[in-house]
Structure formats: structure tokens, C-alpha cells
Amino acid sequence: MIGRRVRALLLAVSALLLAATTMPAAHAADLGGATLAEVSGTGIHNTYNDKSAYTYLADALDTGTSLVELDTWANVFTGKWNVSHSNPLGSDNNCVKANTAADLHTGDRNQNLDSCLDDIRIWLQAHPAGHPLMVKIEMKNGFDNTLGMNPTSFDAYVKAHLGSTLYTPADLLTKSDGSRYPDLDTAARANNWAANAALSGKAVVEIIPGTFEQAVDPASTWVDVVYAQHLKDLAAAGTIDRAAVFPSVLGAQAVDPRTRYSDSTLHPWFVVFDADAAAWVGDGDTQWYDANHYLTVVTDAYDVSPALSSSDPSLTDAQARVAELAADGASYISTDWITAPANGVLGEVLTRG
């Protein structure tokens, strides 16, 4: 543990030196042959909802962030995926209907999820050297089979709009010789993730259960369980190439949180985890995630003791906190630091662990 804290301090000092010399934050090329699971990036909580700081979603992407977050609702009347924080029947966000990169910073906002994903794809294609982007989707009210808004249709939807920029579960499973690991867990523990540099201009999508479905539905029907079962079924049928996203386990902690799922056959289909940053650091031993090459997303970076401002800490403090969480094994560090000077941390990509 002491060694990890020393490493965090060294990373923080390094970050300060970078800032002092006005050098850009680390990019994928600076990390040698590190895989996606061996780096830590910084992201923006509820990216779609920060219209005052980011008039358009592309403005947030322009910061060099490694993670954006979208909240989506299955609209029970229209059968469309809305993107908003609290409106289940309409979209309220900074996404536009873009067809080219020239459209990303103009036009009507408040579009549905398809347009948000289009914006991301178009931006990534216009920035092919940019480091990989994690797209975190909170599915507020989950899937809705009665409307056909199920994992199968969601796969097709995501693939249609992210296209060739998407890194999929099948990509993780596939070895260099073309053969495949039997499940995501085995592939992750073998560190079969692509090199971070090779994923420049690519997106990885994780989905998490939404606050609404957690409040009203039994855990057995949440999107994490439903999608893991979907992955298992696709693999058994030999059609895993159809899968588009990675289900994430909420509440990452020192002990494997997948044990909460009563069906142990689903466990190998979870390799992405989500945690509160304060709880993550407080657990004291989260190296298990790093050692097994699982991806981890930690939220509310400001809330680790000593707590920082949730919106505008000094750049020095923000960089030190990101370095601390990277040393503690976080893959993606989600923040609300969207104003200067703290937003200077958003483009940082550090060595993990």
C-alpha cells in the first residue's frame, strides 16, 4: 500500500512538471505497448448534461477526455432511446444531428441516443490519433422487451451508429492467431485487450443499471444481468460477433463483486467494473482488478479524502487526485471538473497501477 502511495506521489509530481512546462498531457503514443487495461484516463460525469460548459457534445470530446457518459431512457411511447437526466419521455442533451465533422458544433441539440453515438463516431473519425474513448451508458429504466428494446436490438443500434470505431466483446475474445478465448474473463486475465495505441480513434461502450430500474425492478432484471446472459447465449450459439457492449458491475470493491450474481455462469462475462472513488480507495486493496486486467471506472473523484471541490479544485490538486486513483488501479476516473483550471486534467492518460 505504501508503495502505491509513493507511486501516486511520483505521478502527481510528474503531472505538475508537465503543467509547469506547458507540455500536453500524455497520449497513447507515450505509453509504449501498454494495453487498454494498463492505462488510466480521465472522464466527464454526465457529459451530455453539461450544456453550460459544453454547448455541444463535441466540445467535451475536444478536451481530450477518455470517458463520456450518456444517460438513456427506453421511451415507452415512441420506442426510441432518449438521452436525458430525468425526463423519460424526451431528450435533453448537447447532442446534434451531425453528418460530418463540420456539423458537430452547430444545429439543434436535445437529440436521441442515435445522434449522440453518431456525434461520437464522427468526432473519432476526425481525430484518428486520439486515445480510446470509453462511452459509459447508464440505462435509466433498462431494456424493454415489450417494445423490442432488448439486447439484440440494442447491439444492432449501437453498431449502426458507432460503426468501425467500436471495440467489441468479440475483439477482446479474439487471439492474434484468430482463435478465441472461451469467455471475457479468461481473455481479460490473459490481457488480450488491444494495445492502447492500436485503439486510437476507437470507442468501448459499457452499460450500467439505471437509477430508475434499480428503484423499481428486481435485480435479476437489471441490464447487467440481462446483458451478461445475452453474451453467454451469443457465445454458445457461435454468434458473439453480434455483441456491441460490455456490461458493468456496480460497486467494485476489494472482494470480487460478481459473487452477488446467483448464477455463477454469468460471472465470466463481466470484465468491466464501476465504483465510487472514495469507496475504491477506502477498500485498501483493489489491485485484484489491475492484476487481472479488468477495466474499472471510478466516479466522484473529488470525494476521496481529503475531499476536493466537486467542480473547481486547483489544477495541482486535480492532477494529484487523478494520479492517486491511477496508482490505485482505476482505468477511468470520472469527474465534474469541467471549468478552468481543473479541466486541464481531462486529457491526461497515465500508466495504471
Predicted regions and their residues:
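Secretory targeting and sorting signals
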Residues: 1-28
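Catalytic cores of phosphodiester-bond hydrolases, prominently lipid phosphodiesterases
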Residues: 29-353
